Amino acid sequence: MEIMEAEPEFSNLYAVPSYIGQGTHNYTTVGLARYVTTVANSGTCYNLSILDKLTDSKGNVIEDYTPEVRNTVDLDNSLWNAIHSGMRQVVEKKKYYDDLAVHVAGKTGTAQQDKTRANHALFVSYAPYEDPEISVSVRIANGYSSDYAAQTARDVYKYYYGLAKEEELVTGTADTLDATAGTGD
């Protein structure tokens, strides 16, 4: 099952701030997830889909949905290696990832809309760093700091890899997260 998505909008104002992501760019979170998945596998971009397979009540596969390639990005391996290494270094600097049993690569981002609202928090990532199988993108509107988005992604990885139980992660109350635990954006 393919998901139709909105076309991304590239910034058309403020050339210098736009260069670092502070312009009028407009991307969906799922579009960013597809982007980071393309980065994780060094250039293969897939169509978005929400189903892996359809099974009956006994677990028999009725239909298997094979990912479809949308396009590829051809870069020299040295560039891909530099990108992967840089994204790994971003996460290595985050203290709240120190005890995670899986290596994650990611990129933080804090988008400033205006001075009357809190910044938007963003974190795109993939794991395991050595052989990617999952990407996670978190955007928190008016979330103040990308560290909050990165800590939320950490919890997704904990759940996905069975490192924490759902009850430990979903408590029904908001967590007090530590914006000083990372090194900032």
Identify the residue ranges that each predicted region occupies:
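Beta-lactam-recognizing serine transpeptidase/beta-lactamase-like catalytic domain environment
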Residues: 1-141, 181-185
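Short, surface-exposed, charged/polar-biased interaction segments
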Residues: 53-57, 104, 145, 157, ...
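Short, gly/Ser/Thr-rich active-site loops of penicillin-recognizing serine hydrolases
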Residues: 61-68, 154-185
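Intrinsically disordered, low-complexity acidic/polar segments
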Residues: 133, 145-147, 163
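Short, charged, low-complexity patches
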Residues: 32, 145-154
